[in-house]
A protein has these predicted regions:
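Internal maturation/activation junctions in enzymes
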Residues: 12-119, 128, 253-254
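Extended C-terminal subregions enriched in glycine
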Residues: 160-163, 195, 204-255
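Low-complexity, Gly/Ser/Thr/Pro-rich intrinsically disordered linker/tail segments
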Residues: 242-243, 266-285
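Active-site rim segments in enzyme catalytic domains, especially the processed small/beta chain
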Residues: 112-176, 181, 205, 209
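Alpha-helical support elements that line or immediately flank enzyme active sites
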Residues: 8-11, 185-207
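Short Pro/Gly-enriched beta-strand edge/turn motifs at strand-loop
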Residues: 81-92, 147-157, 245-247
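Short acidic-glycine loop/turn motifs at beta-strand connectors
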Residues: 108-110, 173-177, 265-269
Length: 285
């Protein structure tokens, strides 16, 4: 849901013309992330326990209205969840997602494509092994304050409930139903931001998937903008003065758990890309 919202809210902007070297493009991406993550925090939880207004969250009219809140010349002063069709009253909680996840994208000789993300939450999960499998400690993905201002939190702890996850394995198709791109990532709450950035870089900026994944990634937590401190983040770090001029007053440069990979269809075959920040590789067998 978050990736669909991030991308769709930006449709009225010409990201292709702006390009990857323009601070305005990254500003727009950050603003769209703010809106999408506000909705995610308020409305997304285990659908067996809470009413998730999925159709309303990705409705074209709702997306259009949310996207119109974004300005190319300034930041939004305050961002809160919207009121999509079918949404019950909700308040955002506070979660503590941990970036210990794995993802792979694969294609076989017949063109069948898979995007798979798996997680045990923390490093080695719960520290327990059963039948050769590491058991997870996914309880830490819940919001531990169950009620805010008298309103139940969608991702609150309940017996037998699945916690909200950031896992976002994604396959992108063209208008004829052919696969263009498969991409996913590890990195806890940064996953939707990594995936959205990679899709924009391939589709709008015409980057090879390897270059798209290697581009800097920014993550937004409320009003705080996080820029990675790795060498890959240097081009984005150089844009900080311009981003501050657009109203992003709280910017932090720090290490972030970015580990994306993907495959894209090219003339005559497929091309892979793996995050240079991680131990992953692109490999043909």
């Amino acid at each position: 849901i978050a990736v669909i919202q991030i991308l769709a809210q930006l449709q009225r902007f010409d990201l292709a013309a702006l390009g990857a070297d323009n601070p305005v493009a990254w500003h727009l991406l950050a603003e769209s992330e703010r809106l999408a993550f506000a909705d995610r925090a308020a409305f997304v939880g285990d659908p067996d326990f809470v009413q998730v207004p999925t159709a309303g969250l990705i409705d074209a009219g709702y997306i259009r209205a949310r996207g119109e809140l974004i300005s190319a010349s300034s930041t939004m002063a305050k961002v809160s969840a919207g009121r999509p069709r079918g949404a019950p009253p909700r308040k955002a909680g506070t979660s503590n997602e941990v970036p210990s996840t794995s993802h792979f994208s694969a294609v076989d000789a017949r063109g069948n494509v898979a995007a798979l993300t798996s997680t045990v939450e923390g490093s080695f999960g719960s520290g327990l092994i059963s039948g050769g499998f590491v058991l997870n400690n996914e309880l830490t993905d819940f919001d531990f304050v169950p009620v805010v201002d008298g309103v139940p939190v969608a991702n609150r702890v309940q017996p037998g409930k699945r916690p909200r996850s950031s896992m976002t394995p994604t396959i992108v198709y063209d208008a004829k139903g052919h696969v263009l791109l498969s991409v996913g990532a590890a990195g806890g709450p940064t996953i939707p931001a990594q995936v959205a950035k990679s899709i924009i870089a391939v589709i709008d900026w015409k980057k090879p998937v390897q270059d798209a994944i290697a581009l800097p990634v920014m993550m937004v937590f409320g009003d705080r903008l996080i820029v990675e401190s790795s060498p890959q983040g240097a081009p984005l770090a150089a844009m900080i003065p311009a981003l501050k001029a657009l109203g992003h007053s709280e910017i932090t440069v720090t290490a972030l758990p970015y580990k994306a990979n993907g495959i894209e269809r090219v003339t005559g075959g497929w091309r892979g890309g793996a995050d240079p920040r991680s131990e992953g590789v692109a490999l043909g067998l």
